[in-house]
Amino acid sequence: MKGVDDTDLVPDSAGEGSRVFHDQLFAESNSAIEDFRFDGATASVFDDMVHRSVPFYDEMQRMTEEITADFAVPGTNLFDLGCATGTTLLRLDAALDPRVHFIGVDNSLEMLEKGRQKFLARKSTRRCEFMAADLHRERIIEDASVVIMILTLQFIRPLHRTRMLQGLIEGMNEQGCLIIFEKVTLNDSLFNRLFIRYYYNMKKRQGYSDVEIARKREALENVLIPYRPEENYELLASVGFSHVEEFFRWYNFSGILAVK
């Protein structure tokens, strides 16, 4: 893997004084490809990676803020599952009542540390905790008016998704909401192929090479497992959500709002 130096720096979109490195994790064509991991190397380039790899990422953040404002209740908890480097929590901190408690959850200690440092640099007075947890095994949701999963559910092993969501909804308050953004697959093979190609074209426009795209696809093959949109709707309804609706779609990316 290529090292990073000052030539790899890009502007800090969070504006919180942390350095953001240019994503070149998969630029080396000779190194062995391992399963994708949210380790220190990924954490160092993550903010650049999501802005270049996720279509309309800033709009996803804006929509999350807009929806959350209608559901977050002062004195209750807001959970960001798979909070990564804390981008979503930083944005919500400026928008929500300070009495809403924030809990960012991730299984990557390196991601959590970056999120913690960014939040400390903000000098917010809000109660905010960054928690290490494995969503496959641990039930951590309690007194939650809002739960956010931005590109997180797709990394939960399929055999664990129902149980994880059951534990999640049990810890949510009535009329609480779950906001999900997911990569999805489709029943129709024609549309599936087309949408995947359109997505890779988007990544090329963001500066990724064919080699980088192919190597990352292979690294994610057994790690990121997307469902069809209908499977996600049925899964959410089956664990007890009374309202489930898709509110965002870009080819093979979907946003879902579910209310208990």
Swiss-Prot record:
Residues annotated to bind S-adenosyl-L-methionine: 57, 106-107, 134-135, 217
HAMAP family in the cross-refs: Cx_SAM_synthase (MF_01589)
Protein name, UniProt field: Carboxy-S-adenosyl-L-methionine synthase
Function: Catalyzes the conversion of S-adenosyl-L-methionine (SAM) to carboxy-S-adenosyl-L-methionine (Cx-SAM).
Keywords per UniProt: S-adenosyl-L-methionine, Transferase
Gene from which the chain derives: cmoA
Transmembrane segments: none
This enzyme's EC code(s): 2.1.3.-
Annotated organism of origin: Nitrosococcus oceani (strain ATCC 19707 / BCRC 17464 / JCM 30415 / NCIMB 11848 / C-107)
Lineage of the species this protein comes from: Bacteria, Pseudomonadati, Pseudomonadota, Gammaproteobacteria, Chromatiales
Database matches in InterPro entries: CmoA, Methyltransf_25, SAM-dependent_MTases_sf
Superkingdom of this protein's organism: Bacteria
GO BP: tRNA wobble uridine modification
Subunit relationships: Homodimer.
Pfam families noted in UniProt: Methyltransf_25
Similarity comment: family membership: Belongs to the class I-like SAM-binding methyltransferase superfamily. Cx-SAM synthase family.
Catalytic activity: prephenate + S-adenosyl-L-methionine = carboxy-S-adenosyl-L-methionine + 3-phenylpyruvate + H2O
CDD domains (UniProt xref): AdoMet_MTases
GO-annotated molecular function: carboxyl- or carbamoyltransferase activity; S-adenosyl-L-methionine binding
PANTHER family: CARBOXY-S-ADENOSYL-L-METHIONINE SYNTHASE, TRANS-ACONITATE 2-METHYLTRANSFERASE-RELATED
